[in-house]
């Protein structure tokens, strides 16, 4: 069994892949849904994802978890790989430091975005833009599930290579 098959099995065992009619965050609908909260709170899934992501990064990389779903993934991967991470908020908070990027980030630092699910890719692109505005160099994004609905292409338009652990096809073809 491949690493992809193992992860698909873990996602299904956590009941993270559901079928029915679902409204998605971008306003579209889908006959299936991948519940990030179920796979991100399942220790077997989270551990497998962190190990797979850690294998795909260099030791001098900083990770950036896209709030909310990318944060536990970035934290687990950073712990697994022994690298730092920052949090990319959807918008700057209106209190405290009012930062959009939380954590230590040096100018020119190489950052890899970590995201749970890519549908259109817009959330990841927004995080990339915020990180670049903060001085980071961002060329890669690690995604757990690529729904194969344009996310890879949108990220590529912004100069970011997407690496997904599983695709919608992997999830839907598995029985």
From Swiss-Prot:
Pathway stated in the Swiss-Prot or TrEMBL entry: Pyrimidine metabolism; UMP biosynthesis via de novo pathway; UMP from orotate: step 1/2
InterPro entries: OPRT (IPR023031), Or_phspho_trans_dom (IPR004467), PRibTrfase_dom (IPR000836), PRTase-like (IPR029057)
Reaction(s) this enzyme catalyzes, per UniProt: orotidine 5'-phosphate + diphosphate = orotate + 5-phospho-alpha-D-ribose 1-diphosphate
Domain of life: Archaea
Residues annotated to bind 5-phospho-alpha-D-ribose 1-diphosphate: 89-90, 93, 115-123
Presence of keyword DNA-binding: no
Record keywords: Glycosyltransferase, Magnesium, Pyrimidine biosynthesis, Transferase
CDD domains assigned: PRTases_typeI
Enzyme Commission identifier(s): 2.4.2.10
GO biological process: 'de novo' UMP biosynthetic process; pyrimidine nucleobase biosynthetic process; UMP biosynthetic process
Record-annotated membrane-spanning stretches: none
Assembly, per entry: Homodimer.
The protein's role, per its UniProt record: Catalyzes the transfer of a ribosyl phosphate group from 5-phosphoribose 1-diphosphate to orotate, leading to the formation of orotidine monophosphate (OMP).
Family statement: Belongs to the purine/pyrimidine phosphoribosyltransferase family. PyrE subfamily.
Protein's name according to its UniProt entry: Orotate phosphoribosyltransferase
């Amino acid at each position: 069994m491949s690493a992809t098959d193992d992860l698909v099995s873990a996602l299904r065992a956590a009941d993270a892949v559901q079928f029915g009619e679902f409204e998605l965050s971008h306003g579209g609908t889908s006959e299936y849904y991948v519940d990030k909260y179920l796979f991100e709170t399942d220790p077997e899934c989270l551990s497998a994802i962190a190990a797979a992501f850690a294998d795909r990064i260099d030791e001098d990389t900083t990770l950036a978890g896209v709030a909310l779903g990318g944060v536990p993934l970035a934290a687990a991967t950073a712990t697994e790989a022994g690298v730092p991470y920052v949090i990319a908020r959807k918008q700057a908070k209106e209190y405290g430091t009012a930062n959009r990027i939380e954590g230590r980030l040096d100018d020119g630092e190489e950052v890899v975005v970590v995201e749970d699910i890519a549908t259109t890719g817009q959330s990841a692109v927004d995080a990339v833009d915020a990180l670049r505005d903060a001085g980071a160099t961002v060329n890669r994004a690690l995604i757990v599930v690529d729904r194969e609905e344009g996310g890879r292409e949108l990220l590529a338009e912004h100069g970011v290579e997407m690496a997904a652990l599983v695709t919608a096809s992997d999830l839907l073809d598995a029985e």
